[in-house]
C-alpha cells in the first residue's frame, strides 16, 4: 500500500512506518534463523547480499559487482570496492568467506545450509575476489547466493558475529525488539544510488489482521502487507490508499511431517489430499485472489511449472479407499493460525468440513500467533503454512525439500 498523494519520483526525507503481519518474540538477528517477513525485511533493510533479485524478477549484482564461470562449477564473484559496513569496516572477500562458512559448516543450524551443500570450497583470491567451487555444475548458482539468509556481515579473525545487526545496507539498525518493532536511520555512506530515500524506517509487528488494516486506514502506519482478501475491497475505497497486487510464487500450504505418526502413512496422506475441496479454498478464503495448487511448490510463475499434472480433486470414494487402507482410526489434529496466512484458521475449518463428508474426523487446533514459527511449524504433525516461493525451481526444492536442509 502507498499513499496516492506521494509523487512517483522519490524524494529524500520523512519516516516510513510499515505494519508487518509477522514477527515473534523468538526472532533473532541471526540471518540463518530468519523465517518470517518481519525478519527478512529487517535483514534486507540493514544488509546486502552478493546478488539480488530485482523488482522485475531479474537477477542482478549487489555486493558482487560481477560474476563469471566457464563451467558452471567454479564461480568467481568480483566484489564492489569502497563499500563500508555500518561499523566503518571496509567490505573484503574475507567477510564473504566467513559469512558463507558460518551458514555451511556441518554444525550450522542455518536454514541456508541446505542451499550450500553443493559448495565444496570457498576461498578469497585477494581482497575483492571470492572463488566458490561446487561438486557439480549449476547454472543457477548466482540465484542461490541472493538468498535472504546469506546476508553479508563483517568478520574478525575469520568469524562473524551472527547476532549483530551490522551490515552494508541503506539503513542502520537503531533498535530491535523481537516480535515488536525494528527502527532504522538512513546510512549516510550507502553505496547504492537511487535507494534509501527515507530518513528513518520503522517496522512494527502487527499480527492481528484487523489491527493491521485499521492501522493503515487510520494513518498510524504508511503501508502494510498481507491484506485480508475479505476486506481488500473495503480498503480500496479509502482514497489515500492504493492496493498493490501482483502474481508471483507465494503459496499457502498445509504440510505434514512424514516422519511422525500418523503422517508417515502414505495412504493416510493420500486420503487427506483427496478430501479437500481446493476450489472452495480459492473461492472462500482467497476470494479469487489466487489459483489452485496441486501438491507441489512450483507455481505458474516458474518456467518449469508442471502444467500437465492431473489436478487433484475432491474425491470421497478414492479418499475413503486410501483411508481404509491406512488402517487409521480416530481424530487427526490440524494446527492452524492466521500467523501462517490471513484466513488460515477458516481454511482449516473448511478442510475439516470436507473431510467430515468423507468420514474422516479432523480437529482444528487454533494456535497462538506469537511463537507460531518456532513452536508449531516444523514441530506439530500437520499445520498451516506459507512459502514466499523462489525465483528458480532448484532454489525452491533446495530450501525446503532436500533431506539435509534445516527446514525439512
Which residues make up each language-model segment?
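Periplasmic binding protein-like
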Residues: 18-19, 88, 222, 353-406
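N-terminal lobe/hinge region of extracytoplasmic solute-binding protein
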Residues: 19-71, 101, 166-168
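Aromatic- and charge-enriched surface segment that lines or borders ligand/interaction sites
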Residues: 65-109, 125, 131, 215, ...
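Surface-exposed binding/hinge segments that line
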Residues: 68, 78, 112-154, 175
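Ligand-site clamp/hinge motif
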Residues: 189-234, 361
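Periplasmic-binding protein-like
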Residues: 231-234, 259, 263-302, 343-347
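Structural transition elements
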Residues: 292-325, 339-345
Amino acid at each position: 500500500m502507498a499513499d496516492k498523494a506521494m509523487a512517483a519520483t522519490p524524494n529524500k526525507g520523512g519516516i516510513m512506518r510499515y505494519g508487518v503481519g509477522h514477527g515473534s518474540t523468538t526472532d533473532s538477528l541471526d540471518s540463518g534463523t530468519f523465517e518470517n517477513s518481519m525478519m527478512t525485511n529487517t535483514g534486507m533493510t540493514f544488509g546486502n547480499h552478493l546478488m539480488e533479485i530485482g523488482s522485475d524478477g531479474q537477477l542482478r549484482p549487489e555486493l558482487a559487482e560481477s560474476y563469471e564461470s566457464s563451467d558452471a562449477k567454479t564461480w568467481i564473484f568480483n566484489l564492489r570496492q569502497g563499500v563500508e559496513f555500518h561499523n566503518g569496516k571496509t567490505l573484503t572477500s574475507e567477510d564473504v568467506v566467513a559469512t558463507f562458512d558460518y551458514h555451511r559448516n556441518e554444525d550450522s543450524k542455518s536454514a541456508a545450509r541446505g542451499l550450500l551443500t553443493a559448495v565444496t570450497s570457498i576461498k578469497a583470491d585477494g581482497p575483492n575476489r571470492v572463488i566458490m567451487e561446487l561438486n557439480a555444475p549449476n547454472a543457477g548458482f548466482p540465484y542461490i547466493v541472493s538468498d535472504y539468509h546469506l546476508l553479508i556481515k563483517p568478520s574478525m579473525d575469520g568469524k562473524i558475529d551472527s547476532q549483530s545487526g551490522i551490515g552494508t545496507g541503506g539503513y542502520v539498525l537503531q533498535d530491535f525488539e523481537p516480535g515488536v518493532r525494528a527502527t532504522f536511520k538512513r546510512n549516510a555512506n550507502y553505496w547504492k544510488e537511487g535507494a534509501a530515500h527515507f530518513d528513518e524506517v520503522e517496522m512494527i509487528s502487527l499480527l492481528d489482521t484487523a489491527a493491521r488494516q485499521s492501522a493503515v486506514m487510520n494513518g498510524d502506519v504508511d503501508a502494510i502487507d498481507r491484506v485480508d482478501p475479505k476486506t481488500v475491497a473495503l480498503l480500496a475505497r479509502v482514497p489515500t490508499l492504493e492496493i498493490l497486487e501482483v502474481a508471483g510464487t507465494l503459496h499457502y500450504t498445509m504440510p505434514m511431517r512424514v516422519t511422525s505418526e500418523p503422517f508417515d502413512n502414505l495412504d493416510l496422506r493420500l486420503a487427506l489430499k483427496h478430501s479437500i475441496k481446493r476450489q472452495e479454498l480459492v473461492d472462500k478464503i482467497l476470494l479469487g485472489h489466487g489459483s489452485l495448487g496441486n501438491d507441489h511448490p512450483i507455481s505458474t510463475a516458474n518456467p518449469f511449472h508442471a502444467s500437465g499434472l492431473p489436478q487433484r480433486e475432491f474425491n470421497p470414494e478414492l479418499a475413503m479407499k486410501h483411508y481404509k487402507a491406512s488402517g487409521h482410526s480416530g481424530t487427526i489434529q490440524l494446527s492452524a493460525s492466521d500467523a501462517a496466512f490471513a484466513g488460515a484458521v477458516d481454511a482449516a475449518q473448511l478442510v475439516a468440513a470436507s473431510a467430515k463428508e468423507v468420514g474422516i474426523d479432523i480437529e482444528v487446533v487454533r494456535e497462538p500467533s506469537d511463537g507460531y514459527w518456532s513452536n508449531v511449524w516444523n514441530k506439530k504433525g500437520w499445520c498451516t503454512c506459507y512459502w514466499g516461493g523462489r525465483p528458480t525451481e532448484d532454489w525452491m526444492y533446495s530450501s525446503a525439500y532436500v533431506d539435509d536442509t534445516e527446514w525439512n
